[in-house]
Structure formats: C-alpha cells, structure tokens
Amino acid sequence: MKSLRPASLCFLAVAFVLIASARAQAAAPTDRPIIALWPNGTPGSEARRTEPEKIVGSNVSNIHQPTLTVYLPAPARATGCAIIVVPGGGHARLAIEHEGYSVGQWLADQGIAAFVLKHRLAKDDATPAGTTQPYTIERDALADGQRAVRLVRSLAAEWAINPATVGMLGFSAGGEVVALTAMRAAPGDTTAADPIDRPSARPDFQALIYPGRSGQIIPEKGAPPVFLAAGYGDRTDISEGLAEVYLRFKRAGVPAELHIYAGAGHGFGLRESNKSPAGAWPTRLREWLVDRKFVPTK
C-alpha cells in the first residue's frame, strides 16, 4: 500500500481543523484520521457546524459535521477492499463503539480498509423536545451515505483501494441508511467542480446487520450483492422480515446470503466477549467477500 501523499495530508489537515470540538474527538480513537465529508461545511448544516457532539457513554448524537474515521490495514495485509461502516441507534444516536470503531479495527486487521461514518440523525436525541428535527433519513442521512462512498472512491489511489470494491456495512438504523444508499445509487458527475462528486455513489456490495424498515428494502435487478444477518429473537420485522428481504434479492437475481442466529436478539454488533455463533458473523462476512471476489483469496 502507498503511504499518504502530501495532497492527502493537506486534505486531512483541513478536515481535522474543521471538525467541531475537542469533546467530540474524545469518543474517537486518538490515533485515527478523521475526515469531514464536506470540509467547507455540510450543505444544510452550515449554521450548526461548530456545535459539539453529544457523547453519552459509547453513544454519539448532535451530529452536524458528518465524518469518516479511517482504519487502514497494514500495507502487507491490504486487500484493496474498502467498507464504510454505519452504526445503528434508532436514528437518535450512533452506537459508535460495538457497531463502529470495533468493527473498523477488525476489518483493518483483515486487510480491509474501513471508514466509520458519523451521519446526520433524523431523530437526534439532542434536539429539544417539541422542536422540529432538522434532518431526515431520505434527504440528509442518504446524502451523507452517498458522499461517504464518493469520498472513499475519490481517495482510492492514495490508499491503495480498488474503486470497484467499495462497499457498505450497516447495523439496525445504519442498515437502513446502507440499504437506501444502495437503492438510490447515484451516478457520478464527471464535470462536477468538486472532485469528490465525480465518482459514483453506488456501493459495490452491502452488508445489512439486523436492519430496520425491512419492508422498505426493495432491490431491483442489478442491485449491489447483499450479506444479511440477524438474530432469531429480534423483533418480527427483522427476524422474519429479513427472510423476505432475502427472497426479494433472489427474485431480482441479485446474489444474497442470509444468516439467522438462533441464540441472538437485536444489537449484538461486534464485541470481543461474544463467543456465541452470532459473534462470528464478521468471519462469515469475510468468507462471503472472498466468495464474491471482493477480497482476494490469500
């Protein structure tokens, strides 16, 4: 893998300056680069870009400057594959540890470049009661998901990433954002003034881990291949609904793999302490990536 070139270092430096507050940084690993999706300010969020994020335990909310936290693999292990990780949290907060940073580190250890997305929240728990939420899923969370895919592709050469193997992985509400980004696969604009807007926003694959709103996941022919996982004990729209999602992908002729774990419920994420079969879903995901040729066989 090539090291970061001066242009990339400059880009990162600008992004660091523009990320809102030291308090917000406290929740993120201190040794990881953090990149603002829009270094000059997020469209529609300009007036609130300097507000600090709200951090309660491992949950983050009050996000007005969407970012990617970067986990690059060791050069000797790099596969060229990249995954944007989208934590869940009911669109009110992001469960940034067990559905974000721990996943990013695991993927990097497997040779996969990972980027943990903090996106704008449609039901942000930092918004005062009785106040209209400033963001929506289909406008702002989607825009952040699309921008994240484009940003990673735009810097693929700098990070030795194959721009044809850039996927997304989402948990719960984050799975909704991933599925929506895949369904609203926006092409790039080769004439755009902003070079980040030139690549396609279509993820090459998607992994949906106990995603919500399963009834709204309607793939079309040519949709990105999908890896699905959930717990038998999850709520019905997920534990049963994900089986129907799998069938929709199959009927559309889109490669799909489904895992339902008998002993699991909702929100198992990635925890080192989870030694159950559900705790091994990341290994199953990596096997699927190899099988689909997004990750080379070692």
Regions found by a protein language model. Give the residues of each.
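Primarily recognizes the serine-hydrolase "nucleophile elbow" in alpha/beta-hydrolase
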Residues: 140-223
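Bacterial N-terminal signal peptides
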Residues: 10-19
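Serine-hydrolase catalytic machinery in alpha/beta-hydrolase-like enzymes
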Residues: 34-35, 41-60, 64-67, 74-83, ...
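Short beta-strand/loop motif that positions the catalytic acidic residue
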Residues: 228-230
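Bacterial N-terminal signal peptides that target proteins for export
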Residues: 1-11
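C-terminal catalytic histidine-bearing segment of alpha/beta-hydrolase fold enzymes
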Residues: 250-298
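Conserved alpha/beta-hydrolase "acid-adjacent" motif
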Residues: 235-241
